Amino acid sequence: MEQSSLKFIRNFCIVAHVDHGKSTLADRLLEMTGTVQMRDMRSQLLDSNPIERERGITIKLAPVRMTYRMNNVQGTMYNENQNEIIHSSLYILNLIDTPGHVDFNYEVSRSLAACEGAVLVVDATQGVQAQTLANLNLARKQNLTIIPVINKIDLPNAQIAKVIGELSSLGFRKEEIIAISAKNGTNVDQVLEAIVSVVPAPNGSTSSPLRALIFSSQYDPHKGVVCYVRVVDGSIIAGPAVSISPQIHPQGDPGFGAPRARVTRLQFIASGVEVDPIEVGYFMPKMLKSRGLETGEVGYIATGLKDVALAKVGDTITAQSSVFSSRFSDKSLSVGQLTGKQKTEKQISDNREQKTDNRVIPLPGYKEPKPMVFLGLFPIESDKVSEVRDALGKLRLSDSAFSYKPISSLALGHGFHCGFLGLLHAEVVQERLSREFGLNLLATAPTVEYKIKIKNQR
């Protein structure tokens, strides 16, 4: 991808208080951009976990790649971020839908780190709420461009003028506030136009060594650890040297179809482990295999790793060699020399310092969340302890906000002391352990940490 092609990418997330209409707005965006056919549409499409759909809340962040053609611009214009907006150009919109409940706020903070913009949704009947302010502050700390949106204007008890006043008091101009009905699709096209016109394009370097931020992950029995990544610099190509069709890039960049060297090995900077990617691709919203991920794009990397501890959220992925280029710089280099044996087992290098001394600076990671509620989980069957340990490790891969450590009780035997961000978080984790891993667990009463102040040294 040429550096100029970055101007056609927008990375943004939707944030709001719980039940203010984030998922409904995401549904309308998917529908209006043609990402999902009408026959396949259903409410809360990005909430793929059955628990999310049953409870009516978003628990885990969900990325999706959309395309949108800007037709309401005549000629060429520039926005306040000096983005060049071109008439009839096709833009790649990478959306990350986020939870609204405070117990899953860590998911929001990880999403924001992968974006340049945020759509802040406020319910017209409720106005600004606690998580509205919390998410707004998180977005501002990340220096994101924020698009204020008032949702549910179709309801008879909507107080649009009042909510506009509340948003104005938070520093937004009245003319930039968009009033919509995500349910009916009213004015949602204005949100799409604002995303293209207001949110800045990624500012990564296509010629720099590969740097990709892991903002989430999951475990697949066949593909191993699947990392959700935002490519900040450089590019990654999976498979042998190929010529990529210009149609993959919306602008048909003539240089985009040039031969590409395979990244024979990727490296996780924090753990030092090296892998050959089994598969890379986009979220459409289901995983769709592609031939590569370019600078500024959001997608996934199937690593083949079976040890979930080696791929941590917040880590930086780079090429094992920092001299990777998307075009062959040495014409004498053969495809055979570029192809390496696929590895699916962990590879901790003995000479890690030498291999990471490639002048690639790791991206800022994430601050570990502090658990607020604690409880013990013990298997009903004492011989299932190892299964519980494996399940907790795999579950933590997709929910890094909870922690666990082994404990032993005279009455209950061996188990795990687990920390959560709240009671709802604890309930969801226990339900996932039961449904996804078939575990029968005994949970102790929830507790919180106490701070003890000793007086007179007694």
Predicted regions located by residue number:
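Structural and coupling elements of P-loop NTPases
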Residues: M1-N72, Y78-P250, G257-S321, V335, ...
